[in-house]
UniProtKB/Swiss-Prot annotation:
PANTHER family: CYTOCHROME B. It comes from the Eukaryota. It comes from Thomomys monticola (Mountain pocket gopher). SUPFAM superfamilies: a domain/subunit of cytochrome bc1 complex (Ubiquinol-cytochrome c reductase), Transmembrane di-heme cytochromes. The chain crosses the membrane at residues 33-53, 77-98, 113-133, 178-198, 226-246, 288-308, 320-340, 347-367. GO terms for biological process: mitochondrial electron transport, ubiquinol to cytochrome c. Its cofactor is heme b. PROSITE patterns: CYTB_CTER, CYTB_NTER. The gene is MT-CYB. The cytochrome bc1 complex contains 11 subunits: 3 respiratory subunits (MT-CYB, CYC1 and UQCRFS1), 2 core proteins (UQCRC1 and UQCRC2) and 6 low-molecular weight proteins (UQCRH/QCR6, UQCRB/QCR7, UQCRQ/QCR8, UQCR10/QCR9, UQCR11/QCR10 and a cleavage product of UQCRFS1). This cytochrome bc1 complex then forms a dimer. This is Cytochrome b. GO terms for molecular function: metal ion binding; ubiquinol-cytochrome-c reductase activity. GO terms for cellular component: mitochondrial inner membrane; respiratory chain complex III. It is found in: Mitochondrion inner membrane. Binds 2 heme b groups non-covalently.
Length: 379
């Protein structure tokens, strides 16, 4: 008689994904972030669902409803801060997950990688529309500035912006549709995450050495279920420390003021996880050029499989590429800092140089390093 988990139509799927999945024996803690992203998504959907029960998507009452959640709803303050900081946790895990993919050459699984890029775009869209919902000063002006960027698109730009706004400015119609988008997008992300996993399990996981490990794979359970569970516990510990001790550390003080279309904040900036892209956008004086650079800063990831020149998959034994990878990470941290600074010297030139270095590293330096390493190894 076969075991039920191996024969039952539904349990069979779960079994193939979480129990009997053949997994490389040497994957490190950096491979935990996929499951941690799943945990973050579930956390965000659950906290978001409870917030949606008390939130009203109307310009007159949106700000008050968030205040009501924090003051009058049982543990509303906790749910609200878990949701707000959960977005930061999500992006920390997401960026580490992408960084691991670049470092160990996981982008060579093209289908999985491209679905991942689509997931990144959708997550960024979800976070952006969600940031508008509390209807504070930075919410309102952030929505105005970022949606206005679409007006740079030739010919249809202005019509497109007014179509998204549902009027001639960011108003009630905009808030209502942003709430609708913010509610539905996480479920689309969850469905795409399943497709992401489906494509990954077609090829099997990569490993730090970047070599085939079919001959010595081990079952996912109990080895990696235990390892993932440890990751979840550690991350929740850090996350709850942030939520309970420093809930407003990553937020903007301007969002504690209700949205006022007649008063512009001195420095409009998005949440910290978008600052690197915002810095790239601002580094180009031309509006359309800035928008193109902004989109390309993320879309450039899709080129990585085609820019891979090394005969080795992973960067584990490629010191030249490793150095460039850490230069790229440092550059992104620099761009994140610049994105939060006002547009004045010396920040303008630093932002422009950091933006050039970002594109130069990915498009030119990393492929060149791969070729040089091949030459040095006489491959």
């Amino acid at each position: 008689m076969t075991i039920m988990r191996k024969s039952h139509p539904l349990l069979k799927i779960v079994n193939h994904v979480f129990i009997d999945l053949p997994t490389p024996p040497n994957i490190s803690g950096l491979w935990n972030f996929g499951s941690l992203l799943g945990m973050c998504l579930i956390l965000q959907i659950l906290t978001g669902l409870f917030l949606a029960m008390h939130y009203t998507s109307d310009t007159l009452t949106a700000f008050s409803s968030v205040t009501h959640i924090c003051r009058d709803v049982n543990y509303g303050w906790l749910i609200r801060y878990m949701h707000a900081n959960g977005a930061s946790l999500f992006f920390i895990c997401l960026y580490i997950h992408i960084g691991r993919g670049i470092y160990y050459g996981s982008y060579l699984y093209k289908e999985t990688w491209n679905i991942g890029i689509l997931l990144l775009f959708l997550t960024m869209a979800t976070a952006f529309v969600g940031y508008v919902l509390p209807w504070g000063q930075m919410s309102f002006w952030g929505a105005t500035v970022i949606t206005n960027l679409l007006s740079a698109i030739p010919y249809i730009g202005q019509d497109l912006v007014e179509w998204i706004w549902g009027g001639f400015s960011v108003d009630k119609a905009t808030l209502t549709r942003f709430f609708a988008f913010h509610f539905i997008l996480p479920f689309i992300i969850a469905a795409l995450a399943m497709v992401h996993l489906l494509f990954l399990h077609e090829t099997g996981s990569n490993n730090p050495l970047g070599i085939m490990s079919d001959c010595n794979k081990i079952p996912f359970h109990p080895y990696y279920t235990t390892k993932d569970f440890l990751g979840v516990i550690l991350l929740l510990l850090l996350f709850l420390s942030l939520v309970l001790f420093f809930p407003d550390k990553l937020g903007d003080p301007d969002n504690y003021m209700p949205a006022n279309p007649l008063n512009t904040p001195p420095h409009i900036k998005p949440e910290w996880y978008f600052l690197f892209a915002y810095a790239i956008l601002r580094s180009i004086p031309n509006k359309l050029g800035g928008v193109i650079a902004l989109v390309l800063s993320i879309l450039i990831l899709a080129l990585l499989p085609y820019l891979h020149t090394s005969n080795q998959r992973s960067m584990m034994f490629r010191p030249l590429s490793q150095s460039l990878f850490w230069i790229l990470v440092s550059d992104l941290l620099l761009l994140t800092w610049i994105g939060g600074q006002p547009v004045e010297p010396p920040f303008i030139i630093i932002g422009q140089l950091a933006s050039i270095l970002y594109f130069l590293t990915i498009l030119v330096l990393l492929p060149m390093a791969g070729l040089i390493e091949n030459k040095l190894l006489k491959w």
